[in-house]
Amino acid sequence: MMTQANAYFYDGADVALLNGQYTDVFSLLGMHSANEGKALIVRCFLRNALSVDVISIKDGRKVASLDKVNEQGLFAGTLGRRVKPFLYLLRVEYPLCQLDIVDPYQFDSLLNSDDIYLFGEGSAERAYEFLGANWRQTQGVEGVHFCVWAPNAKRVSVVGDFNHWDDTRHVMRQHLANGLWELFLPNVVEGAHYKFDLVYQNGERHTKSDPMATQMECAPHNASIVPPKAHHSWNDTAWMSKRAATAWHKAPMSAYEVHLGSWRRKGEQGEQYLDYQDLIEQLIPYVKEQGFTHIELMPISEFPFDGSWGYQPVGLYAPTHRFGDANGLKAFVDACHQAGIGIILDWVSAHFPKDPHGLVRFDGTCLYEHEDPRKGTHPDWDTLIYNYDRGEVRSFLLSNACYWLREFHFDGLRLDAVSSMLYLDYSREPGQWLPNAYGGRENLEAISFLQILNQRLYQAFPGICMIAEESTAFAGVTKPTDQQGLGFGFKWNMGWMNDSLSYLGRDPLYRQFHHHQLTFSLMYAYTEQFMLSVSHDEVVHGKGSLLHKIPGDDWQKFATLRAYYGFMWGHPGKKLLFMGCEFGQRNEWNHNQSLDWHLLAYEPHQGVQRWLKDLNQLYQDMPALSVQDYEGAGFSWLDCENSRDSIFTFVRYGLAGDAPLVFVINMTPQLHTGFRIGLPLAGDYREYLNSDSQIYGGSNQGNAGTVVAESLPWQGMAQSALITVPPLGCLVIGPATGLAEAN
């Protein structure tokens, strides 16, 4: 019933509204029928207002002046003879100004039932188009549609610099059935700062960043930012068509892993990041010159702590502010594509940090994470693990993956820490984890999510590459999902990386006793579609740079590094190398400063860089190095047992008509002359590459560019040749002209 003192509000509604305790605000505020449909009533809540008039948007005429219900800012009034709702604005007189405000409480819900269903089901691929802050137009009025998922909140408001961060000003519409809260706000400008203000069931109030924000403030501030209306105009049609037609498992793929904040810096003391335009002008030409086919970016979703390198993101949908805005990032990706360079994004779906403005206990409950810490917390990083069993969480992650691929044209995702997703007992002692429904250690919900993710992404985005960082022997990581695999395109070969780097750090005198560390990887090379990775993880935290790992004097260090790269580029599998490794960085990586580019003033570093460039060129020119990466017919040992000399010889084969390539790698400083190797074809051979050449900083021991096969069977081949094998060197030998008949 109405109170006698207040004819516009039901008993207690005005008090509840003033105290922020009235959640169904759309039933109260805005325009409503009154007096059994014979009149219209408008109610509004505007703190500090002196007077409020209702103005028709259609003709600009004043319809009514509202009564001031109380001094706290409640206004209400009937609209004379009008009975049909119409669009209006509120002309508000404040002590120092007058404002025209389009009343947000006159608009119906903008949510679509199909979107809501898919979001709850866990299959939404475009949730970012209705959640977060999106520019919309309804009934001819433009504004920002705010929407957030918080099913257990008692009340949610959008607060920002457009309402002086007043939590009672813009209380959102609640959808009880699905836990969504929404509000369409006209009079909001691009770049406005905002957050969501949530009242929990226990009465506590917390402000949170928008989980779907596409732009955020820089730390230590954490407001979300209304995005710009303008969008990037893409010019990469040719690349996207080529990508869709490329079978990457049969194509050359060498990725240059980049941390944008430390690849190179500017400013007198190197204190400034390069922005995206700088990166277009500097990074892209460098990668192109070095012959890499792809750039892999370490995470760029907004993260507050620089020392996390991006692996603890709070704004999963927001490109970090550090290098520019979203349109700048799109321009950078576009420029990569126009230069013929693919670009892969590191994507963190295994965990999220506990920053209070982030996802942790978002609505007062464990919404995105598991309630039980035995399943919901990550013991290694003190972070939280997503609840992959919850449909809305799956939609949040699936939509985010689609967001980067669809809106930014990334050519694939590299998923971080996949092993921690697959196992419930990952880094946990007995009693610290919960088994699955069958009593096992596999995280069945995470496995299902990864399968759905890969299946959906490969269907929606032709030619992308999905890459897993998975460090265990979990079976079927790169098997198709219809064969019960996880459905990734590639998996980092962590076993090869650990073994080969261990071998690299051994004294050449003792390498003969560890020969298997370079040969064992071929025992399992075809169980998955592997990518050989030497990533940022191998040159930090006291591990030292690659050059630092290698024993010996400088000459031996550089020669060994070149030979190692030769082995890596000859080994089956795609390639990934962290920035700085391509020129022999001496210091281990420091995310707070630029790479040591001054080292390129010295010939040994120039030599390593030139060697990598030539390896990449050969890799792209010779199909034998990629077309059968995942077929046993693409590789054959000539001799994998010469541990005494620490020499490795093998052949890489392409398809019919492709020239085979012979690799000879010597991992000791001993020069070998008159060394016989088997050859797959008769005729003259060319020394394509020799890491000991003077142009790479070597001692120039080799075969003067030519090797002649003779009809002497050796190492299972019908012909062979005597060659000179340089110390700590790599030779790549192939047919000089046309192909003779193979054995």
From Swiss-Prot:
EC number per UniProt: 2.4.1.18
Q: Which residues form the active site?
A: D416, E469
UniProt-recorded Gene Ontology molecular function terms: 1,4-alpha-glucan branching enzyme activity; cation binding; hydrolase activity, hydrolyzing O-glycosyl compounds
List all membrane-crossing ranges. none
Which reaction is the catalytic activity of this chain? Transfers a segment of a (1->4)-alpha-D-glucan chain to a primary hydroxy group in a similar glucan chain
What GO cellular component term, any one, is given? Answer: cytosol
Q: Which UniProt keywords apply?
A: Carbohydrate metabolism, Glycogen biosynthesis, Glycogen metabolism, Glycosyltransferase, Transferase
InterPro entries xref list: A-amylase/branching_C (IPR006048), Branching_enzy (IPR037439), GlgB (IPR006407), GlgB_N (IPR054169), GlgB_N_E_set_prok (IPR044143), Glyco_hydro_13_cat_dom (IPR006047), Glyco_hydro_13_N (IPR004193), Glyco_hydro_b (IPR013780)
Please report a single Pfam family linked to this protein: CBM_48
As given in the record, the signal peptide range reads none
Record pathway? Glycan biosynthesis; glycogen biosynthesis
SUPFAM superfamilies the UniProt entry points to: (Trans)glycosidases (SSF51445), E set domains (SSF81296), Glycosyl hydrolase domain (SSF51011)
Enzyme class label: transferase
**Can you supply a Gene Ontology BP term from the record?**
glycogen biosynthetic process
Briefly state the protein's biological role: Catalyzes the formation of the alpha-1,6-glucosidic linkages in glycogen by scission of a 1,4-alpha-linked oligosaccharide from growing alpha-1,4-glucan chains and the subsequent attachment of the oligosaccharide to the alpha-1,6 position.
Please report which protein family the annotation says this sequence is part of. Answer: Belongs to the glycosyl hydrolase 13 family. GlgB subfamily.
Q: Which PANTHER family match?
A: 1,4-ALPHA-GLUCAN-BRANCHING ENZYME
Partners and quaternary state? Monomer.
Q: What is this protein called?
A: 1,4-alpha-glucan branching enzyme GlgB
